[in-house]
Structure formats: C-alpha cells, structure tokens
C-alpha cells in the first residue's frame, strides 16, 4: 500500500504529463488517504457538528475507516442526506447550510485530495478561486505585480 504523499505525487506527475487517471476507485481502499484526510478535517470548527446522525470526528477510528473501505469495496456505499440548517447573514436574511455526516465528509475529502493532485497542475496559474494556497489575496498580488495601467479609457453610450 502506497503512502499518501507517494500516491498523490504520482498523480501530480501524471497530471503534468497529461496522462489519464487509472484505477482511481481502487485508491479509495487506501487507509493512508483517510488518515491524511482526517488530519485535514479534524481541526475544522465544523468537525464536531452533527449531520443527520450523531456521528462526529470523535467517533473516528481505524475500525471506522476499515468499515468505510469494506462498503466501498462491495460498491454498496450510500451517501447520506445532509442536514439542512439556516444561518443568519449580516443583512438579516437566512442562508441554507448543508451539514453532511462525518463519514461522507471524510470520503469527500479523500476524493477531493485525489482529484486536486491530478487536476490542479492543469489549471491556469491565473485562476485563484477555491484552490489550495490561493485566494483573493494571491489574485490581488498578481494584479499588483502584472498590471501596467491603461493607455485608453473609452466611455460612451450605445443605443439603438
């Protein structure tokens, strides 16, 4: 069984070379990926939030990982519905928020790690949204370092 970093490194290399992904579903049987995903998720404030079941990060164990892998091997895994709650926004309106059960969060993080390792190197370097170590600050930094100003400004009204 390959370690997480070894496998994700191989995926990055395949992504850089444009080689196709192969046997990805089988990698969902790798317990090292789940332990790494757990390490990324357990620090989040929402890790202790319950979904439709009482399952939280506290219930995590290697036995739980083995149980998830066993169900995946038999292709019987069923995603559970997310608990829908509404949280208040600053303007007084409410925003819906889906709270999945812990095992779904964990499996989704494993899948995200695999897909990110393969596809992230294929994305544009100018894309900053929803990517690791990128965001609005890196976008602003890129604008600051590359924008040279403008020579012309055209203002007008186009009508029929």
Regions found by a protein language model. Give the residues of each.
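Non-catalytic, polymerase-adjacent accessory regions of viral genome-replication enzymes
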Residues: 1-66
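Sequence-level motif detector for i,i+2 pairs with an aromatic at +2
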Residues: 6, 36, 82, 94, ...
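Residues at alpha-helix boundaries and the short loops/turns that link adjacent helices
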Residues: 18, 31, 105, 117-118
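Active-site-proximal segment of RNA-dependent polymerases
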Residues: 26, 115-160
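Short, charged low-complexity intrinsically disordered segments located at boundaries
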Residues: 36-42, 55, 64-73, 96-102, ...
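Reverse-transcriptase-like RNA-dependent polymerase core
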Residues: 41, 70-93, 106-114, 141-149
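Short, conserved non-catalytic motifs in the polymerase core
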Residues: 45-58, 79-106, 122-134, 154-155
